[in-house]
Amino acid sequence: MSFDGFFLHHIVEELRSELVNGRIQKINQPFEQELVLQIRSNRQSHRLLLSAHPVFGRIQLTQTTFENPAQPSTFIMVLRKYLQGALIESIEQVENDRIVEMTVSNKNEIGDHIQATLIIEIMGKHSNILLVDKSSHKILEVIKHVGFSQNSYRTLLPGSTYIAPPSTESLNPFTIKDEKLFEILQTQELTAKNLQSLFQGLGRDTANELERILVSEKLSAFRNFFNQETKPCLTETSFSPVPFANQAGEPFANLSDLLDTYYKNKAERDRVKQQASELIRRVENELQKNRHKLKKQERELLATDNAEEFRQKGELLTTFLHQVPNDQDQVILDNYYTNQPIMIALDKALTPNQNAQRYFKRYQKLKEAVKYLTDLIEETKATILYLESVETVLNQAGLEEIAEIREELIQTGFIRRRQREKIQKRKKLEQYLASDGKTIIYVGRNNLQNEELTFKMARKEELWFHAKDIPGSHVVISGNLDPSDAVKTDAAELAAYFSQGRLSNLVQVDMIEVKKLNKPTGGKPGFVTYTGQKTLRVTPDSKKIASMKKS
């Protein structure tokens, strides 16, 4: 979900309990649009992160350590002047909007009492962090300067009077009176889109969840939703302050820890995406090209359906050769295949026998085309399957795995090796410890590793696992030739997790002995065929997978 007003409401409550009456000890700006305050509160030190990033804007406590620039910016120098040693008096969310105001008190150089408000506006590309004088509402400094030419509604420059962002007529879902709420719930269309316009601070996911629950007892359902306790929940791709329906996620003790984990993982994913962008683009282009090629080949194969018709016409002309006239462009003969008369087109320049041979040649040509096209289609389908497997691996790869996937694409001829580019050393296969505490399970994280694991490392009697009919890793239970059902389930869950079905609630996984696997001649790396497998059904669990991994 997005960092919406609903999420912000919960995190402000968390920050208020931790930081109010604390003192600001240090102020740093590790990145251009981010600010970190070190605060001493309740005999503990906390790091408060405020981010005006256009995509990752947020406010949270963080355990992450940052490297600070050697030379502080003007913004930081002004903040240190007003905030160093300041007491945090309050932390408030403006209505249910994505604006937080932190009021602090301090003493200036001559000992006079002063108050200031540190404001963070989390509004996408318009996100900002401002320090405002409490009494005069004058802006003391702002992390992003916005002049009149950029925004005619309000100027965000030092010395300007602070004007809040324009408000809408939408209502605060946390403070709305029962009478007004009852009227809305009875008279308005309660779709997610309409709920977003009626109430402040609802992101798409929050609005979708609210629409889902507003079916019966709407007033109490609404109140219960907005009054529920914070129970942070992290999924593979999102986060929420409370668990949403159909959202199997990992619980967290607090929202700040959840955000630390989410943004650390997201930063890793973004770095991987950046590093892998060339490979992803190349694979997507090759997939598109091969899918287009497959459609064309299938159309051409469809056009060969009349091959049998040519053979039959050749046979009929041969059988009734004496009835076929010269110098005619057609003849009608009895068709003993259908017991109906048939008209056969002729070439007047040819003899009856030559016309028959012409039909046989056309039949033979189409017959050869069928075999040729069938082989081509199988080859193209295999290429598409291979590229889909690479695409799956790329989407799940870490930074250290990108180079090995590139090497694989070089070896399979999809990209060229750069000048002076070294051949990548093969990374060791990942090992996981099964629930019995002793069995090792190997996982191939790309097709070269899959090939090595299945056809070089694994013993014939060992069990092999793969997600059914979708791209994924090869998984082998090593050494244990009679594994328990629990160990088999562990291996199946690994195969499900490292597959295209990672985010599914239920994944089918094939299990078979290595000796029953077949590597087709000329097949792409990691491609196998098999029959006689058993199929398990499991649910991928990221937390369990992480706990199984051997360091």
UniProtKB/Swiss-Prot annotation:
Residues 363-551 are annotated as: Required for fibronectin binding. GO terms for molecular function: ribosomal large subunit binding; rRNA binding; tRNA binding. It comes from the Bacteria. Associates with stalled 50S ribosomal subunits, binds to RqcP. Interacts with human fibronectin. It holds the Pfam family NFACT-R_1. This is Rqc2 homolog RqcH. It is found in: Cell surface; Cytoplasm. GO terms for biological process: rescue of stalled ribosome. The lineage of its organism: Bacteria, Bacillati, Bacillota, Bacilli, Lactobacillales. The gene is rqcH. Belongs to the NEMF family. InterPro entries: NFACT_RNA-bd, RQC_Subunit_NEMF, RqcH_bacterial.
